[in-house]
Amino acid sequence: MKRIILTYTLAFSLLSAYAGEGGSPPLKNTDKSLLIDYVDPFIGTTNFGTTNPGAICPNGMMSVVPFNVMGSSENTYDKDARWWSTPYEYTNCFFTGYAHVNLSGVGCPELGSLLLMPTTGELNVDYKEYGSKYKDEQASPGYYSNYLTKYNVKTEVSATPRSGIARFTFPKGKSHILLNLGEGLTNESGAMLRRVSDSEVEGVKLLGTFCYNPQAVFPIYFVLRVKKNPSATGYWKKQRPMMGVEAEWDKDQGKYKLYTRYGKEIAGDDIGTYFSFDTEIGRAH
């Protein structure tokens, strides 16, 4: 029996610039009638080329790139394991989200932040546990797609000059969209989130230290909107470890704490937000 699945569309805008309602990524041209149909975005994505196959417009401020360089020993390379920095490596296999705002072909630990990840089942905000292997990669100018085997989720992303667009196709059941502000390629830390509504958050993330320049630091501002109203929303934050008696009464010490009822601003070095959905069969949005 064919399984009917539901698609959520969201728009991720940089510098608080929103380019309209989130829509579907452009259809791919299969007859090679345009010169861009001969472009292979995977060129340079391995052997220290440090390019990436993500979606970006020419001279665009937003790029949406698969982030597969952390979280698993099964990867060929890890972002912190050698003198090598890129949000994407072709031979790696473990996906922990889509990074927004990236450098391609540079090789310095900068940007590669605002990690957006779809998951299913019980909510888990630890990237080492919620990451997934993937298959069926496709990329063309302005478009990227893959299939997360852990969750049976198809992911698709595209970009406008100032915003990113993502479409996640979930199976029936509980599903989540996670925004991780604690991890990324940059060596800088610190972020703030504010919930505007059940379907929208805005915030700021500190980036910088380009090519090991510790004072080259700057903030970026963003807005994230989901098209469908979630069944639940919340934050998370990594708690400091405690010792002795203090540790006995705080079950979240040293772990990721979920904030399920707190709705005001939140800030920290390792924070994030989630949107949860109840995916139904045959219901389109």
List each language-model region with its residue ranges.
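Accessory carbohydrate-recognition regions in carbohydrate-active enzymes
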Residues: 22-283
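Bacterial Sec-dependent N-terminal signal peptides
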Residues: 1-26
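Intervening/peripheral non-core polypeptide segments
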Residues: 1-2, 281-285
